[in-house]
C-alpha cells in the first residue's frame, strides 16, 4: 500500500495528481469517495485533463457502478475505471468487516517501517544521504504515511449496534481516519473484484487500483 497526503484543495489539481499516480502505478481502477466534495473531483476526472508538469493529456474517465453519476458528464472516449463509494451505515459495516478479514488473513502488504525504509533508501539511492531535508522527506513520506495509517487503525473503536448488528467504527477525540478510510475503501473494492473474478472459471490476472 502506497499513500501520500493530499494538501491541494483545487479539484482539478487533485484530479491531475490522481491520474499521475494512476499512470505511475499502471493502475486499472480508481476507487473514489463521491460524497460531498468528492463529486467535484469525479467531475474533473470525467474530463480531458492536461498535465503541464509532465506535458501529458489524460483521457477522461467515467463511473463503472453508478449510472446517475456516470450521466453527469458524458464525453467520447471515457474510460470506465472509477468505482464510486457513497458510504452508509450498512456499507461502512461491510467495509469494516472486509478490512478486518484482509488484515487477519495477511492479504494487505503495507510498506516497511520508516527506519527500515531509510536503510533501504541509503542502500538504493546514495544521493539520499547528502540530500537536503526536503528531499529526504520526499523519499521518506510514504513510509511515514504508513506509520500514520497504523496509528490510525490502532486508535479506532469498533462497536456492534444492538438492533442491527452492524459494525460502527469511531475515532477517538482528536484522531483522524482519512488514511484508514482510503485503504479500507480500496480493500472493499478489491474484495468485490476478487469475488467476481473467482466466480469466472476462465481465471484472472492481478490488477492495480488507485484510491
Describe each model-derived feature in a short phrase:
Residues 1-160:
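Mg2+-dependent endonuclease catalytic cores in nucleic-acid-processing enzymes, primarily RNase H-like
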Residues 69, 133-137, 166, 188, ...:
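Amphipathic alpha-helical interaction segments
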Residues 159, 176-211:
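Acidic two-metal-ion nuclease catalytic site recognized across multiple nuclease folds
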Residues 162-173:
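Short, solvent-exposed helix-loop connector elements
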